Amino acid sequence: MTLDLDAHKKDDKLLITTIQQEYKILAEYKMIESEKLSGIYVIPSYANSLQWFGVFFGRQGLYAESVFRFTILLPDRFPDDKSLPTIIFQQDVIHPHVCPYTHSLDVSHAFPEWRCGEDHLWQLLKYLQVIFSDPLDSIRGIEVDKLKNREAAELLMNNKEEYVARVQENIKESKEHIFDTPPTEDPHYIVFEKFQQDVHGPVLERIKAGRSKQTEPSAQQGNGGHATGLSWVKEGEFKPLSIE
C-alpha cells in the first residue's frame, strides 16, 4: 500500500511539473506574439510543445527574399534548464553562425547559457533576425576559429561576391521548396498555398480595406480553435499576406 501511495505521489508531482512547464511555454509563445517580429513565424508542434515549427522570411540585406524553414527544439526541462534551445534549418544555409553539416544555428555567442526568467524565445528569434540582416556585423569581435562555418566567414570577409552568389543559391533553393508537401502530419506545421483568386481574393480585399480579423500565420486558428499552421502566398511573391 505504501508503495502504491508513493507511486501516486510521484505521478502527481510529474503531472504538476508538466502542467507548469506547458504554461511557461505558452507564456513564451504569447510574448512572441506581442513582439510582432517582422518576417518570422513560429508555432509549437501540436504533438510536442518542446518542438516548434518556424519560417524566416528575409526582408533586407544579403538574405532578402529568402524563405528558410527551421525547427526549434527545447530542452526537456525548459525553461529551467541552462541548456540552450536548438534551431535547425531544413536546408543548406550559408552563414558564419550556421553549421554546414547539421544546419544548426550557433546562438552561444549571444546566449552563453539559458537564464530562466531573463532569456526568452522572442529574443532568440530576434537574434536570428539580426544576424541575417547583417551577417558581417554579427561576427565582429569573434575569432574565426570559434565560428560554426569558418569557410563562410572567410568568404564574407574576403570574397563577398562569392559569398553573395552562395547565398543566392540558398535563396533559390528555398523558394523552390516553399510549396512542398509537409514532411509531417502535425496540424501545426506551417503550410503555404499558392494564391487562388476565388479562395483568397476576398480575404486579400478585406486586408486591403483594413477590416481583416485574421492573425498572422503563426497564430491562425481553425479546426475548432486549434491553430492549423495554414497560410497562403500571393502568386509571384514569396511572403505571406497579412495585415502587417
Swiss-Prot record:
- Which SMART domains does this one have? UBCc (SM00212)
Origin superkingdom: Eukaryota
What are the recorded Gene Ontology BP terms?
Answer: defense response to bacterium; sperm individualization
- Map out region (Disordered) in residue numbers: 209-244
Q: Which Pfam families match?
A: UQ_con
UBC core domain: residues covered? 20-176
- Xref: PANTHER family: UBIQUITIN-CONJUGATING ENZYME E2
Recorded family membership: Belongs to the ubiquitin-conjugating enzyme family. FTS subfamily.
- What is the name attached to this protein's record? Protein crossbronx
Q: Which organism is it from?
A: Drosophila simulans
